[in-house]
Amino acid sequence: METMASPGKDNYRMKSYKNNALNPEEMRRRREEEGIQLRKQKREQQLFKRRNVELINEEAAMFDSLLMDSYVSSTTGESVITREMVEMLFSDDSDLQLATTQKFRKLLSKEPSPPIDEVINTPRVVDRFVEFLKRNENCTLQFEAAWALTNIASGTSQQTKIVIEAGAVPIFIELLNSDFEDVQEQAVWALGNIAGDSSVCRDYVLNCSILNPLLTLLTKSTRLTMTRNAVWALSNLCRGKNPPPEFAKVSPCLPVLSRLLFSSDSDLLADACWALSYLSDGPNEKIQAVIDSGVCRRLVELLMHNDYKVASPALRAVGNIVTGDDIQTQVILNCSALPCLLHLLSSPKESIRKEACWTISNITAGNRAQIQAVIDANIFPVLIEILQKAEFRTRKEAAWAITNATSGGTPEQIRYLVSLGCIKPLCDLLTVMDSKIVQVALNGLENILRLGEQEGKRSGSGVNPYCGLIEEAYGLDKIEFLQSHENQEIYQKAFDLIEHYFGVEDDDSSLAPQVDETQQQFIFQQPEAPMEGFQL
């Protein structure tokens, strides 16, 4: 697991936290396996590649109908690309070149399955389109060739590779300075598709020095569609974790993104927030650069945006920033983030609720004042309700938030969580299949029991007030059951809790694990009945 905080913070936490079972690196969590899962999903709010599909007007309809007849007939074995089309493409007549390039472009714009492979497998056709990109005296030909190449690059990685190998990228970057906005916009679109293909393609485009001309375009353009496409391309240049882009090559975009966050256009805002979420996903140095660009207050404001596609990436960016150290987390808190996060916990979208819980869990991994701020914002009652009733993926994040608070909180703060009823939902998590969450719940209960032991000693009664609450929630039965868990850390923790907090005079020797000296591991009696009660 990645290191979440600076060494100084690590040392401080290890000394100050009463519970060392969850180390600081674990408590402050970047997206791990769920981040990977999210990246693999086709997100409705953001496409990494886009095809330019023409809106057909009546004048072009007859020609397009004939073209489609030709395309449909190709499914019977005839080629959609005739020898005549290829000859016209290589003609010296610029009118024929334009007409034929337009034909190719229309074919490549057809839904749902454009004949990309047939086009790229026709010798020298892609190279010819790249040649046409250089024809500064004929901007219409440049535009049509750029459009055709854009749609080829919207395909598979292999199809995108053909466009790169034909030498299109440096020329597209030059065209960002074209005098013709249509050509500029189509070049941006093509570069966005290429950068969105893979980290290798993204880095190649960055190494071709795209950033300065792209930022210049963004600064000067007054055309909304151009700005939208440019911000989308920029977000693709910032995207990716394995590996991430070289930060020095993308960080110069931060001042421009800071300005774009004040746009009134939802599409533009969404891509600007996604770009910031990618830039803030990493070590604290990256987080600091994002903070220094002055975006935090506006990102927090955008948490309340009425369009889900804006609020979601804004929340991701805010969540990434609070994976930083306590000072970085405090910047977000100082922007009045907690009332916004409380509001998002009631979102109709489960993914937003889950992400809000994850963000809060990283705040409760902070210092005691930050835990108190979460208490003062009345967030914990909602978290405990989520812990009881939500989908499992959201309950997991709420469990982290509560256990983190029991790890770093004061006795008074822990008592407050107990008074809200956190014990029963933590006990309920002891029967889930996810071993990590079972450990998180056990650690939360251990922190509560440790406080109860201190209170029993102080009162002179010697009675731990929280043992009874755990027994009432059937927690003791579940902890006993975990002594036969396959995970060594879980069964050892369960055994230790039973022995330390629920021990009886006549110890039942059958509960104690035996030690296999040869394997250096514990051996447990197999339960007679199969383990039940597991939930997904």
Curated annotation (Swiss-Prot):
| InterPro entries for this protein | ARM-like, ARM-type_fold, Arm_3, Armadillo, Importin-a_IBB, Importin-a_IBB_sf, Importin_alpha
Tell me a Gene Ontology molecular-function term this record carries. Answer: nuclear import signal receptor activity
Q: Where are the ARM repeats?
A: 76-115, 116-159, 160-204, 205-243, 244-288, 289-328, 329-370, 371-410, 411-453, 457-502
Q: Which SMART domains match?
A: ARM
Q: Where is the IBB domain?
A: 1-60
Q: For the region NLS binding site (major), what residue ranges are annotated? A: 147-239
Which family is annotated?
Belongs to the importin alpha family.
Q: What does this protein do?
A: Functions in nuclear protein import as an adapter protein for nuclear receptor KPNB1. Binds specifically and directly to substrates containing either a simple or bipartite NLS motif. Docking of the importin/substrate complex to the nuclear pore complex (NPC) is mediated by KPNB1 through binding to nucleoporin FxFG repeats and the complex is subsequently translocated through the pore by an energy requiring, Ran-dependent mechanism.
Self-association state and partner proteins as the record states: Interacts with ZIC3. Forms a complex with importin subunit beta-1. (Microbial infection) Interacts with ebolavirus protein VP24.
Report what the protein is called. Answer: Importin subunit alpha-7
In its UniProt entry, the species of origin is given as Homo sapiens (Human)
Q: Which gene encodes it?
A: KPNA6
